[in-house]
Amino acid sequence: MEESSGLSSMKFFSDQHLSYADILLPHEARARIEVSVLNLLRILNSPDPAISDLSLINRKRSNSCINKGILTDVSYIFLSTSFTKSSLTNAKTAKAFVRVWKVMEICFQILLQEKRVTQRELFYKLLCDSPDYFSSQIEVNRSVQDVVALLRCSRYSLGIMASSRGLVAGRLFLQEPGKEAVDCSACGSSGFAITGDLNLLDNTIMRTDARYIIIVEKHAIFHRLVEDRVFNHIPCVFITAKGYPDIATRFFLHRMSTTFPDLPILVLVDWNPAGLAILCTFKFGSIGMGLEAYRYACNVKWIGLRGDDLNLIPEESLVPLKPKDSQIAKSLLSSKILQENYIEELSLMVQTGKRAEIEALYCHGYNYLGKYIATKIVQGKYI
C-alpha cells in the first residue's frame, strides 16, 4: 500500500502529528478506494507478487496524545502517526485483513448508488454476504474503523450514517433545508430526535435565545427537566445522548458551540467514574472513535453531581462502587487527560468507595432538579 507522507496528518510540533480523517465528497472517497485496490492489484501483478500488509493508524492509547488548548479553550485527544500492520499471511490478522476489503467493497457500492446506511444496516448486509467473516456488530465496527484508518476519511464520507440516540429540547429553533422550523420547546417531554445525517445537521439553521446549553447524561433526567419546562426558568437548551455520546450527538453539540460560541456548555452526570468518562468524551473525544476522535471536542464544564453535593444526598442513597467503576477510574487516571480538579473528584470517589446518582436529589422533591441547576449557575459552581 503506497502512502503519501502528507496525507491527513497535521504537524503541531517537530515530533508530534495529528492523524485525522478527511471529510470527502462521494467521488473523492470512491477515488481513495480505487487507489487502494489498484495498489493491491499492481503488487499482485508484479514479477515478484506478494500480498501487501495493510498499514493502519494504531488506535491504541500508546499512540494517543493530548492537545491542550492554547489559542482556544478546547483540548482534545488525537491519534499520532504510529502504524499497525494487518496481514493476510498472519493467522491472527488474516480475517481482519479480508474484512477491510469486504467493507470497502460495500462502501464503494453505497457511494455509487448515492445511498447512506447505518452501521447496523451494514452489519446485516455483511452478515448476509460474508457470514464467515462477520458474525457480530463489533467486528463490523472495528472493520469500519480500520477502513477509516486506511483511507483517512470519515465514516460519513464512506456513506455510513451515524446512529443517533440524541435528543434536544428547550429554547432552540431548528430548520432543515426546505422544511418548516421546529420549536424544540414545543416537542413535549420526549424532545426532538437528533438525526444521524451529519450533512443535514451541518445545513440546519439554528436560532436560540438561550444563555446555556446543558447536557444531561440520563434520558429519565432529561425527561423530568423538559416535562417541568425548566428551560422557561433557566434560558437553556437541554441535550441528552442517553449515556455515552454517539457521533451525531457530538456533531450536533459541536455545531451549536460554533454557531453560539458565547453559550457555556454545562454537563450534568452521575457522581461516578462512568459519569466523568461521559463528560470527558464530550470534552476531549475518545480513542475508540479513531481518527475522528478529536473533531467534535467541546469546552464543556462540569456542573454536577460533584463531591460537594454529597451533603445534599442522604447517606443511604450512596451506592458502593462497582468493579467496572474501579476499572474506569483507573483508566481515566492513567490517561493524563484530566485537569487537577477532575482528578480530585475522581480520587474522592475512589477513596470513599461510593457513587451517587442524580435521582438521589429527588429526596428534596421531584421539582428540585431545576432549583439545583439554577443555584449552581448563579453561584458559578461549574468546573
UniProtKB/Swiss-Prot annotation:
UniProt keyword list: DNA-binding, Isomerase, Magnesium, Meiosis, Metal-binding, Nucleus, Topoisomerase
Effect the entry attributes to changing residue 124 to F: Loss of double-strand breaks induction
Source species of the chain: Arabidopsis thaliana
EC supergroup of this enzyme: isomerase
Pfam family name, one: TOP6A-Spo11_Toprim
Cofactor(s) of this protein: Mg(2+)
Binding-site residues, Mg(2+): 217, 270
EC number(s) on file: 5.6.2.2
Lineage: Eukaryota, Viridiplantae, Streptophyta, Embryophyta, Tracheophyta
Enzyme active site: 124
A single GO BP: chromosome segregation
Knockout consequences: Plants show a semi-sterile phenotype and a drastic decrease of meiotic recombination, indicating that SPO11-1 and SPO11-3 are not functionally redundant. SPO11-1 and SPO11-2 are both required for double-strand breaks induction. Drastic decrease in chiasma formation at metaphase I associated with an absence of synapsis in prophase, due to the inability to make double-strand breaks (DSB).
Protein name: Meiotic recombination protein SPO11-2
Subunit comment: Heterotetramer of 2 SPO11 (SPO11-1 and/or SPO11-2) and 2 MTOPVIB chains. Interacts with MTOPVIB. May form a heterodimer with SPO11-1. Interacts with PRD1. Does not interact with TOP6B.
Stated family: Belongs to the TOP6A family.
